[in-house]
């Protein structure tokens, strides 16, 4: 574990040396271009590096992270990432991943966070109000916050479907294009896939009726740099 700044550099040298020893062309191949099939939208929490939990390598995940894994429809940073991932990289899967024991979720629930972070997590406060009865029905606070983490992920997926970028991709029927909702349990290291209310969203007109539950599994990608 890196405890000092110099440890980061030393660890990098060791890691790069080991990689090159095992695969001499690893970095030259990696430098040519990227072609990730996945866009990962996750929390900024230092315990949330998805490549570690999924045993993936550099070049496999296009990543956007922020506090409490928000999909903000007014965040130019996020929307630029989404546009590039969908329209240029042609990712087939978008994964919104939250986690249990999330500090942002807990702070928003208790209403104690202020400043810019308070503004950023206001949408979670709205979830607390909208699902007040469901949350209060759970006596254990930790389990209540776990449910809020799950509700937050599902809400962010719904926000994704509201974007013109995703709507355009759905209308063009991009082969294999799917959006997934995950929650990571840090206490076990395991990922939980959440069920999405697809039929309800179709009834609301959020998702075209022509969109299938499993739109295909075409794994072909062109490589692009950024």
Walk through the language-model features, giving the residues of each.
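Divalent-metal-activated hydrolytic enzyme cores
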Residues: 1-36, 68-89, 104-226
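N-terminal short beta-loop-beta anion/metal-coordinating cradle
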Residues: 19-60
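Short beta-strand segments
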Residues: 41-43, 65, 95-99, 180-185
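Glycine/charged-rich beta-loop-alpha catalytic/anionic-binding loops adjacent to active sites
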Residues: 58-69
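Short acidic/polar active-site loop segments enriched in Thr and Asp
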Residues: 92
């Amino acid at each position: 574990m890196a405890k000092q700044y110099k440890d980061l550099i030393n660890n990098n040298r060791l890691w790069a040396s080991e990689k090159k020893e095992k695969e001499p062309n690893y970095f030259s191949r990696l430098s040519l271009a990227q072609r990730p099939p996945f866009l990962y939208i996750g929390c900024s929490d230092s315990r949330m590096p998805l490549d570690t939990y999924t045993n993936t390598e550099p070049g496999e995940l296009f990543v956007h992270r922020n506090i409490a894994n928000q999909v903000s429809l007014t965040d130019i940073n996020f929307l630029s990432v989404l546009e590039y991932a969908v329209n240029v990289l042609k990712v087939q899967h978008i994964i919104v991943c939250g986690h249990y024991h999330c500090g942002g979720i807990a702070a928003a629930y208790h209403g104690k966070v202020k400043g810019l972070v308070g503004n950023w997590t206001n949408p979670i406060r709205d979830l607390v109000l909208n699902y007040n009865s469901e949350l209060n029905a759970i006596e254990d606070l930790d389990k209540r916050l776990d449910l809020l983490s799950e509700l937050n992920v599902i809400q962010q997926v719904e926000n994704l479907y509201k974007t013109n970028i995703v709507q355009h991709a759905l209308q063009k029927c991009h082969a294999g294009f799917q959006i997934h909702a995950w929650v990571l349990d840090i206490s076990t290291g395991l990922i939980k896939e959440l069920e999405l209310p697809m039929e309800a969203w179709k009834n609301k007109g959020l998702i075209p009726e022509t969109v299938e539950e499993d739109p295909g599994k075409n794994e072909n990608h062109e490589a692009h740099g950024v």
